[in-house]
Amino acid sequence: MKLLLAFRLVIPALVLAAPLHVAAAAAAATPEQKLTALGLTLPTVPNPVANYVPAVRSGNLIFLAGHIPRDAAGKVITGKAGRDATEKESNAAARQATLAVLATLKREIGDLGKVKRIVRVGGFVNATEDFQAQSQVVNGSSDLLVELFGDRGRHARAAIGVGSLPLGALVEIEMIVEVE
């Protein structure tokens, strides 16, 4: 009975706190301020592991190579959705990979406020044959982009299940972004 009472007290507090956190992020003026309000930081941009560059600018478009998720220690988040990771864990990995893409973008343009539009996101999910929630996993990326950029963050998208990814990564996110 005491446990049930504790849940009745804690759950409403969590529900009330969540909108305040989201509201603070929405009120922030720049994408960088929104990251801070959400308690997020951009990771260090890693060096490419093969013969490619992480970003190519052509006119006002920046094509960002696929980025994989890493934990706070810089270790690649690995596994297969549907076997080693749940949909929720895979969604969080997509969010982490998106932060890595944004770190590369910021290094390329200097200020995320210069983003005019997230044009396209490609999401690749390392998954078992029977895993069918690729779209829900890649929502980890899409939702973050809308949180940070508002309507400028709404984009075309592909969410694709694959048999493996570089370094055994759980997900990989690539982007095309229009900038000033």
Tell me the role of every PLM-derived stretch:
Residues 1-5:
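N-terminal secretory signal peptides that target proteins for export/translocation
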Residues 24-180:
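Short, polar/acidic, helix-capping and beta-turn segments at strand->helix junctions
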Residues 6-21:
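Bacterial N-terminal signal peptides
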